[in-house]
């Protein structure tokens, strides 16, 4: 058994007023035993290791609720294009040439970047997900994995079978660090019959569904022309909602769509930087939250972002809403909730996202002893409006240190970078 005592400023994300300027966190193996002010450790707690971080803020690890990790292979390959030309002329042709090994190395690069920027959990959608699982297990992070399913593609049935195998082989793997969902790509790439089969199998196997919904105006137009309804209305008619569904983007929603989301308890993965870069639009996040919809935060893939920095994503989420809705829209603490506790709820993870007794020891420390963090009137405001990836000092998942003093402990990042550079350039040259 391993016992660790961390001394630091602690933001547990258990409530807006909860903050310990001189705090302590006790960890036993993979779980948090106690969180509180200095001196709150019980006499019976004798740590094997003490980590003193007096100038750091320790908070829950960040949760990326929508990404395509291996798309690090395509970073800066296709920029400054709208979604459909971007997908059809650049992204899909490149992805067709990617091997299983390419996806493994691309994912490992993404996980290194995530750890260095304070992300401990991701919801991923891609192909060759056994390779993604392999990378997650090696890196030591937490991952909810879904095989991307384009039902209308020639390999749609094979991909469907691969998603079922993914559930069988990896759901609960890594002492529970890996969970699995089904990943139908979008309403415009899957037939109604295909989506109903996905729903049936997801219910049978007891897993969730991860799908892109209402990302662009073109999608709305296409689905209305085909079915006479918005994508959200059509998916409800099909019966896709009702279980655990994570809908990514949800930029273009009518009032009726928003009410459907609320009534069916659909979870939203909000990706503001990708939505801005691809000119998809501004999602109605304050309106959804006011209806009780749980909204998490995601980066999308690095080919449409172009990084995996959740601190930057938080800042963009706040600023985009303030530009469109007013200065009081989406305050800092609410954005932090989206990146932590509400991210955990979005992924169906009930023991991460806050620092509290019984929860998993998934946490990060941010070095606040830097000029841009003074004066310290508001810790949440600094985390959302000031902090960036390079401020993260320590990362822990399941009580294991994955990064210490910015040094990755589980990934040879220089080797990974060289491998990805070689592989990505090789694919691009062949197109």
Swiss-Prot record:
Q: So which cofactors does this thing need?
A: Zn(2+)
Which is one GO molecular function term here?
A: metal ion binding
The entry marks the following residues as binding Zn(2+), namely: 66, 68, 212, 300
Q: How is the cofactor bound?
A: Binds 1 zinc ion per subunit.
Q: What does this protein do?
A: Catalyzes the deamination of 5-methylthioadenosine and S-adenosyl-L-homocysteine into 5-methylthioinosine and S-inosyl-L-homocysteine, respectively. Is also able to deaminate adenosine.
Q: Which domain of life is it from?
A: Bacteria
Per UniProt, the keywords (alphabetical) are: Hydrolase, Metal-binding, Zinc
Please name the top-level EC class of this enzyme: hydrolase
**Gene3D superfamilies the record matches:** Metal-dependent hydrolases (3.20.20.140), Urease, subunit C, domain 1 (2.30.40.10)
> What is the reaction catalyzed?
S-adenosyl-L-homocysteine + H2O + H(+) = S-inosyl-L-homocysteine + NH4(+); S-methyl-5'-thioadenosine + H2O + H(+) = S-methyl-5'-thioinosine + NH4(+)
Organism equals Desulfitobacterium hafniense (strain DSM 10664 / DCB-2)
User: Pfam families recorded for this chain?
Assistant: Amidohydro_1 (PF01979)
Respond yes or no to whether keyword Hydrolase is given for this record. yes
Q: Which residues bind substrate?
A: 95, 147, 185, 215, 300
Protein name per Swiss-Prot or TrEMBL: 5-methylthioadenosine/S-adenosylhomocysteine deaminase
Task: Provide the family line.
Answer: Belongs to the metallo-dependent hydrolases superfamily. MTA/SAH deaminase family.
Enzyme Commission no: 3.5.4.28, 3.5.4.31
